[in-house]
Design a protein with these regions (language model features):
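Non-catalytic substrate-recognition and accessory regions of acyl/acetyltransferase enzymes
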Residues: 1-106, 111-175
Length: 175
């Protein structure tokens, strides 16, 4: 029996989404109940991390991105200096990894999937613009994960939003 291989593919409803379990019911439900409709409506793009073994494909992670904007007055000065009233941005709306992969601390699947999401944003920003990648951590426990992966907190009290300039991401991933 060979080791499984992994690939990231655009959302397709023909994968078995019901077996996905990241340990967070809201994220599991969003994938199975809302992702397809969101993609079809053009609200966001969803990408699946698929594990291929000898006999099947299994969804073991996903992320969703969508265009947004950041308003200068709502952004930290260190980010928004020199901006017009608002700038185009990309939001990482969802990022989830199956509980089976989260146990593999060596592979760091969460960070790998985040990197894939950032690479995807770089590609779409190169084609259509965007200055910033924004993520809203669902809880304070996720702030450290995103900070370890290059995102900066806004510094505003109680704000769980983090950001990374697209130019910073481009330099980090395409030196």
């Amino acid at each position: 029996m060979s080791d499984p291989t992994y690939r990231v593919v655009p959302f397709a409803a023909d994968f078995d989404l019901e077996s996905f379990d990241c340990g967070e019911a809201a994220y599991n439900d969003w994938l199975t109940l809302h992702a397809g409709a969101s993609v079809k409506a053009g609200v966001c793009a969803v990408y699946l991390l698929v594990e291929r073994s000898e006999d099947s494909d299994r969804v073991v992670g996903y992320f969703a991105i969508n265009p947004t904007q950041v308003v200068r007055e709502q952004a930290p000065a260190s980010l928004s200096r020199g901006w017009p009233l608002s700038v185009p941005a990309w939001k990482l709306g969802k990022l989830a990894v199956h509980v089976d992969l989260r146990a593999d601390k060596l592979a760091q699947w969460g960070s790998q999937l985040l990197r894939e999401a950032i690479e995807t944003v770089i590609r779409v920003a190169d084609a259509g613009g965007g200055k910033v990648i924004v993520v809203d951590a669902d809880n304070s426990g996720l702030l450290d994960f995103y900070a370890r992966n290059g995102f900066k907190a806004t510094g505003l009290d109680g704000d769980l939003s983090l950001y990374m300039k697209v130019s910073t991401a481009r330099k980090a991933f395409h030196p």
